Amino acid sequence: MNPTYDEILKANSLRGNEIKKTPLIHSPTFSDLTNSEVYLKAEFRQKTGSFKIRGAYYKIKSLSEEDKKFGVVAASAGNHAQGVALASSLENISCTIVMPKNASPAKVAATRGYGAKVILEGINYDESYSKAKEIAKETGATIVQAFDDPQIIAAQGVIGLEILEDLPDVEEIYLPIGGGGLAAGTVIAIKEKNPNVKVIGVQSKSFPSMYESVKQNVRTLTGGDRTIADGISVKMPGEITFDIIKNMIDEIVLVDDDEITKAMFLLMERM
């Protein structure tokens, strides 16, 4: 079942003090380069360093007391892993995270630092997720999906509410796409409040799964071995996220690793 705008409002009301409302930061450099006014949504200011804590916290907070007894399991290249690990720690439940073997050592260490048991399996999200499903079947743990879950999507969609609150006259919003949870939730929130805002997804050329799926109007398996944008190295988009994005997003563009790297350095040097 696809998440609704009301579910996004509910996620916003239940986020508590652990989830920050992050600011929009004006970027003079990118504004000059694009001849427009560019703002960056500072999700790196969340405790785990990314927006992923939003969905993980709301999902785990919503589990029944019975489900919490069996703990949770998740697959992630790093950001979702840290979000699930921290949220589990806050709720005092056991947590197992399956991460790709090529995951960032810093992200692996951070995930363990939040108290999770980490298993390294596979070379991308999809292979790690297969292992997570095995663990869930064996232990009864709840799988906290990285993107294809109505509650996860709804909580990520709160970002859209915050953008419109801080910048009501926004004209275009660019969102990274891996599995599509952030883009799906945000586009629901944005289009409900202002359907005239153009929402554009951005995906790695190495893992163009959502781009190809929307293009062919069917979920499509794609992807190489790796990309510098390891957090969006997803070979197959989710069922729910695909259905939302194909019907609501305005456009998806692809960028290669060279373009991503140059943008990263430019951000660090001249944001």
Which sequence ranges carry the predicted segments?
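PLP-dependent amino-acid enzyme catalytic core
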Residues: 1-271
